[in-house]
């Protein structure tokens, strides 16, 4: 027998082994953590750069439970709401879930509610349970709880009903008493720049009194808000930002009595750094005994991005950032040594791209309102996301009021998004439309649109969408195919260049460059949509093969 001919049994075993190894490698690849191609804060040399999250995670609050750090942030009317992030070192973060699968009241949030909904939340861990307190400025302060940070989270309960009650944070005292600190939104309450402390019941789910006003910031600290409550060395501490989102400072109040009087100290401001308005966030300590502070910076169209600052205590006052001139007021750092942790951790980032190979949307995605099951379908057989054309609300003047926009945050200042779209319209209708959008107070999109004589690629812009202004739509080209790749490149200054490709190789720019704008209290977003203007007994649909950020 020729020496090159193997024993059939041996050959079958080899094939089986190769197949097994291939399956293992695919499984490992599928479980590989997300690492952004556009922004990674971990420099890989024991240092990090700010922002640690160059995306819109406004009003962050964080805690440590053992060796794990958990963070929440405002989500306003985006659903799912109250994103929960996890880290092992305060630098590398991943999204692990949302505390709100839908927003209550459900009917109210079935429509877009820009700027409303979930404002600055607080997360705490007490006696084996996670607590998240969050304010809705139109309804009051809510509480949701869970045994695990990944959920399931309890149905929110109303801790206190009222308008303009914002930014709550609890404190469990050593004597068993429970307190809640919060601020006021002038737009609803008719007053702002004040901080109030109230008693909670033992369960922490009901306010027990009218509270006491413990600090008035009108003279020295206008727009004081976002208070976070701590106790250390016999002092009650209220960490709170003041001076406005883009230009303010970080303030700390302290007192030996929970109701004051409170001493005041500015502990961080911009100084000579390029990080404007550094404030509102969370003090956390590490298992190794270090202190750190997470806060946001307002970057207009890019939203409120999250920074990590070193922190130390001097004479029972915190100093946040680096105090180079010794005045007791820190300034933010751009790069710094990473926190010391007990075990090394891998470089990870929140998910951005999506191949749509799962039966669930990636945790980076949010709708503009409470979603319906009829809006989308994830098909794991061919690895695609199908968006059905949903009729726009009769009252909608433009996409500002369209709930079924599927969006995610800008991941950094410069990036490119590309998606592959196959559009199958309902042939009984006209003006079904599906595509790629940059959303904010103004918006732009590149899309495929159905007309009587076929499919067209169109480019649409809408200035002052929040004011009800009309769109401007231009036909780019008549299509001879249902398949097209759509792209938007976001450059510095949030300048957005849309383009398309019919062969997947050559991309052709549309003639205009669009200036992205923030939304209501949020940064601009990028995402997908499929809509129609008429009601009928069935919908067309768009199949998105993938969504890639580079």
Located regions from the model:
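Bacterial Sec-dependent N-terminal signal peptides
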Residues: 1-33
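Carbohydrate-active catalytic/glycan-binding domains of CAZyme proteins
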Residues: 31-550
């Amino acid at each position: 027998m020729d020496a090159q001919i193997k024993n059939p049994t041996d050959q079958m075993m080899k094939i089986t082994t190769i197949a097994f190894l291939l399956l293992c490698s695919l499984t490992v690849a599928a479980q590989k953590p997300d690492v952004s191609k556009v922004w990674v804060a971990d420099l890989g040399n024991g240092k990090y750069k700010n922002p640690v999250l160059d995306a819109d995670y406004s009003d962050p609050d964080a805690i440590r439970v053992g060796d794990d750090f958990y963070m929440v942030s405002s989500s306003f009317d985006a659903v799912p709401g109250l994103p929960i992030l996890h880290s092992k070192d305060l630098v590398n973060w991943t999204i692990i879930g949302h505390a709100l699968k839908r927003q209550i009241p459900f009917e109210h949030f079935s429509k877009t509610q820009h700027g409303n909904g979930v404002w600055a939340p607080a997360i705490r861990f007490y006696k084996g349970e996670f607590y998240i307190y969050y304010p809705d400025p139109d309804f009051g302060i809510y509480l949701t709880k869970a045994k695990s940070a990944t959920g399931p989270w309890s149905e929110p309960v109303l801790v206190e009903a009222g308008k303009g009650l914002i930014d709550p944070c609890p404190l469990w005292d050593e004597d068993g008493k429970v307190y809640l600190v919060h601020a006021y939104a002038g737009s609803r309450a008719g007053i702002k720049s004040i901080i109030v402390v109230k008693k909670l019941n033992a369960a922490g789910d009901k306010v027990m009194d009218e509270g006491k006003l413990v600090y008035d910031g009108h003279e020295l600290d206008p727009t004081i808000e976002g208070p976070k409550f701590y106790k250390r060395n016999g002092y009650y501490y209220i960490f709170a930002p003041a001076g406005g989102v883009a230009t303010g400072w970080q303030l700390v109040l302290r007192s030996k009595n929970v109701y004051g009087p409170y001493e005041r100290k500015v502990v961080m401001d911009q100084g000579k750094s390029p990080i404007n308005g550094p404030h509102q966030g969370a003090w956390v300590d590490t298992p190794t005994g270090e202190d750190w502070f997470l806060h946001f910076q307002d970057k207009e169209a890019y939203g409120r991005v999250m920074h990590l600052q070193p922190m130390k205590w001097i004479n029972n006052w915190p100093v946040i950032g680096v105090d180079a001139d010794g005045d007791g007021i820190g300034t933010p750092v751009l790069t710094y040594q990473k926190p010391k942790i007990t075990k090394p951790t891998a470089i990870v980032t929140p998910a951005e791209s999506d191949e749509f190979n799962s039966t669930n949307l990636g945790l980076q995605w949010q709708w503009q309102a409470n979603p319906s099951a009829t809006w989308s379908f994830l098909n794991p057989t061919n690895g695609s996301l199908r968006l059905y054309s949903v009729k726009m609300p009769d009252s909608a003047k433009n996409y500002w009021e369209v709930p079924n926009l599927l969006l995610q945050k800008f991941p950094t200042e410069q990036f490119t998004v590309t998606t592959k779209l196959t559009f199958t319209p309902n042939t009984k209708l006209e003006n079904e439309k599906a595509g790629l959008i940059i959303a904010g107070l103004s918006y732009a999109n590149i899309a495929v649109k159905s007309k009587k004589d076929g499919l067209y690629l169109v480019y649409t812009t809408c200035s002052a969408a929040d004011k009800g202004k009309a769109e401007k739509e231009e036909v780019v080209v008549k299509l001879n195919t249902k398949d097209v790749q759509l792209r938007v490149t976001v450059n510095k200054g949030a300048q957005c260049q849309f383009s398309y490709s019919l062969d997947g190789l050559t991309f052709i720019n549309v003639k205009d460059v669009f200036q992205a704008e923030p939304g209501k209290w949020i940064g601009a977003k990028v995402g997908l949509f499929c809509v129609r203007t008429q009601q009928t007994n069935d919908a067309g649909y768009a199949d998105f093969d993938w969504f890639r950020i580079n």
